């Protein structure tokens, strides 16, 4: 959600900033802009819409310089337009700012300090940059003014500030919003994500909340909230830039769907010891063993993965498990058990709602485990333990390979804990995950069939329903989410038995209903639910599993262990959703109004 880049060094900044913003497109945005400093002049280029439009405007000018900042905006305060786009400038044009996050007290600050100031935009960001000018006019240095303003802000922010009279510095601060320092020889950068600046460096330093950072081309000074200089080691971002390219695929989403077999193999390799046994850190095992209840905290697709993980944790490991939507949990925490363990699932490791819960549970002294795709992310740093997904960069807004990776890692965790508890395993998990990998490959190879299903069932519809029972119900929720995210079809997932309690009233002639039938004990029941909607005119699409199929089923997935079917059936739903959006000529990778990493609450 939004993205920031910045460069200070020896090279011209404009092209580096534009390329950096292009690498952040996956985060979701509705406008973009850059600001470049040369001598004592700052020039701002910004446009509503895609970065391609911004590039046209920026390339039409010869102005360039060795210092600059850039921003992709996902609207929170004010509609998407040119005036509300970042960067924002102070009234005298001296200060230029980019900001990710939400300032909760901006109206109060505006009323207290900025009476009579004329504002161009509706944003909270413009209040920040006008405050810097205000305190500068009171005689404070730029660093002092910036520090003073940051101390007044309530909410989340990642900030990058330029001063036209001090072209050798970018002033930086953050709180509850991701921002990194990139380190180079004779230059330094800032970025919301290491991917943005891999073009120039792979060496990064973390910025912690409430720190003030002075970035120059040949040094970086980090100060804590008390003004003390902080020494911090750098690390190498272990990301292959080629992993973030589409390669031969038309879209990132299609590429990432096709990568799932490789991701499964990587997970099997990473969580297996030399003797071929499952392995994770013993400290994690101990904390899970000691927990009397697990609370899974997540949002969106990660929440759906958590619902599947609950099945593993309870059925295999024997640990009572609850799955909660992060944005609700933080305001409505239930009565907790005596020895809870909190498991945070987040592809990016930056989900603001989940982080808000983690902050509260850390205050209570509860143990925590993050399952994420990004080492060094906020949730990873602030939790007691981390399990990595090893899925590689996921660029498409609609999550695919992270979902299956999350489920696979949860299955491994559950089996290891089951063994520690002395519970009999009814599954050779590594062997079964290998079967899952082969099954996913078979479905990916059947992409033309999925395209035909999408055409037959979803090309013209405005509504669709996904139904399942037991673990299939959890997958139906994810299938519906994928379809609505990228095709804009109103899609909902329901437990099969709940249709008759209200939803069946929405069924009319031709309404597509996707029924998942991969569970033997409810196979007849879910098929009965399909018959109920067919009797009312629905257009049924049944996805079943080998051994449970019936004549007339639309697609049959290869046979795998019944609790691992979500890893396989969801791939069919991902492809169907992809082709439904493709045939509607929609932007599959960057659907409207959505952001990849939701970094505001």
From Swiss-Prot:
Xref: NCBIfam families: glmS, PRK00331.1
Pfam families, per the entry: GATase_6, SIS
Reactions the enzyme catalyzes: D-fructose 6-phosphate + L-glutamine = D-glucosamine 6-phosphate + L-glutamate
Active site: 2, 596
Coiled-coil intervals: none
UniProt xrefs under InterPro entries: GATase_2_dom (IPR017932), GFAT (IPR005855), GFAT_N (IPR047084), GlmS/AgaS_SIS (IPR035466), GlmS/FrlB_SIS (IPR035490), Ntn_hydrolases_N (IPR029055), SIS_dom (IPR001347), SIS_dom_sf (IPR046348)
Name of the gene: glmS
Subcellular location: Cytoplasm
EC top class, as a word: transferase
BP GO annotations: carbohydrate metabolic process; fructose 6-phosphate metabolic process; protein N-linked glycosylation; UDP-N-acetylglucosamine metabolic process
Database matches in CDD domains: GFAT, SIS_GlmS_GlmD_1, SIS_GlmS_GlmD_2
Protein name, per record: Glutamine--fructose-6-phosphate aminotransferase [isomerizing]
Natural source organism: Staphylococcus aureus (strain COL)
Molecular function as annotated in GO: carbohydrate derivative binding; glutamine-fructose-6-phosphate transaminase (isomerizing) activity
Sequence ranges assigned to domain Glutamine amidotransferase type-2 in this UniProt record: 2-218
EC number(s) given by UniProt: 2.6.1.16
Role played: Catalyzes the first step in hexosamine metabolism, converting fructose-6P into glucosamine-6P using glutamine as a nitrogen source.
Subunit structure: Homodimer.
Domain SIS: 284-423, 453-591
Keywords of the record: Aminotransferase, Cytoplasm, Glutamine amidotransferase, Repeat, Transferase
Subcellular location, principal: cytoplasm
GO cellular component assignments: cytosol
Residue ranges of the TM segments: none
């Amino acid at each position: 959600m939004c993205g920031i880049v910045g460069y200070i060094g020896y090279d011209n900044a404009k092209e580096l900033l534009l390329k950096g913003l292009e690498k952040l497109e996956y985060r979701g945005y509705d406008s973009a802009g850059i600001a470049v400093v040369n001598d004592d002049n700052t020039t701002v280029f910004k446009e509503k819409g895609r970065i391609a439009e911004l590039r046209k405007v920026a390339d039409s000018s010869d102005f360039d310089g060795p210092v600059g900042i850039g921003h992709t905006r996902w609207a929170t305060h004010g509609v998407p337009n040119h005036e509300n786009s970042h960067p924002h400038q102070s009234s005298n044009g001296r200060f230029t700012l980019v900001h990710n996050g939400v300032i909760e007290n901006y109206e109060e600050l505006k009323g207290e300090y900025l009476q009579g100031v004329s504002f161009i935009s509706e944003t909270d960001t413009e209040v920040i940059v006008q405050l810097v000018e205000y305190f500068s006019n009171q005689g404070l240095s730029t660093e002092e003014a910036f520090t003073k303003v940051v101390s007044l802000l309530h909410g989340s922010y990642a900030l990058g500030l330029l001063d036209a009279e001090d072209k050798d510095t970018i002033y930086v601060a953050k709180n509850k919003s991701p921002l990194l320092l990139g380190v180079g020889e004779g230059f330094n950068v800032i970025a919301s994500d290491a991917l943005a600046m891999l073009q120039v460096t792979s060496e990064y330093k973390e910025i912690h909340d409430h720190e003030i950072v002075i970035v120059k081309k040949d040094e970086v000074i980090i100060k804590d909230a008390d003004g003390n200089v902080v020494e911090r080691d750098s690390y190498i971002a272990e990301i292959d830039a080629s992993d973030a390219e589409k390669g031969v695929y038309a879209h990132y989403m299609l590429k990432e769907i096709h990568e799932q077999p490789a991701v499964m193999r990587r997970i099997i390799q990473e969580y297996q010891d030399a003797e071929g046994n499952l392995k994770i850190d013993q400290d994690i095992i101990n904390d899970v063993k000691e927990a009397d209840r697990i609370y899974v905290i997540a949002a969106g697709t990660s929440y759906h993965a958590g619902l599947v993980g609950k099945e593993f944790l309870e059925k295999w490991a024997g640990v009572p498990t609850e799955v909660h939507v992060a944005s609700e949990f933080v305001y409505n925490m239930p009565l907790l058990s005596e020895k809870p363990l909190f498991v945070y699932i987040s592809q990016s490791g930056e989900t603001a709602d989940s982080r808000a819960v983690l902050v509260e549970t850390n205050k209570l002294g509860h143990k925590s485990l993050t399952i994420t795709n990004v080492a060094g992310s906020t949730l990873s740093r602030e939790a007691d333990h981390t399990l990595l997904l090893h899925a590689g960069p996921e660029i498409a807004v609609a999550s695919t390979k992270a979902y299956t990776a999350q489920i696979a890692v949860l299955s491994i965790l559950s089996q290891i804990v089951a063994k520690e508890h002395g519970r009999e395993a009814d599954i050779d998990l590594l062997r079964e995950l290998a079967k899952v990998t082969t099954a996913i490959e078979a479905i990916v190879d059947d992409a033309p069939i999925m395209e035909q299903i999408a055409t037959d069932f979803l090309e013209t519809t405005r509504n669709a329903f996904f139904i399942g029972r037991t673990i299939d119900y959890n997958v139906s929720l994810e299938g519906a989410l994928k379809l609505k995210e990228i095709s804009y079809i109103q899609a909902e997932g329901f437990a099969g038995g709940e249709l008759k309690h209200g939803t069946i009233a929405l069924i009319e002639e031709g309404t597509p209903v996707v029924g998942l039938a991969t569970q033997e004990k409810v196979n007849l029941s879910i098929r009965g639910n399909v018959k109920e909607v067919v009797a009312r005119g629905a257009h049924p699409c049944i996805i079943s599993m080998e051994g449970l199929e019936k004549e007339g089923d639309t697609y049959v997935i290869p046979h795998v262990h019944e609790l691992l079917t979500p890893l396989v059936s969801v791939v069919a739903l991902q492809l169907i959703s992809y082709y439904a959006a493709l045939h509607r000529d929609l932007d599959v990778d960057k659907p409207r109004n959505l952001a990849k990493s939701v970094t505001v609450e």
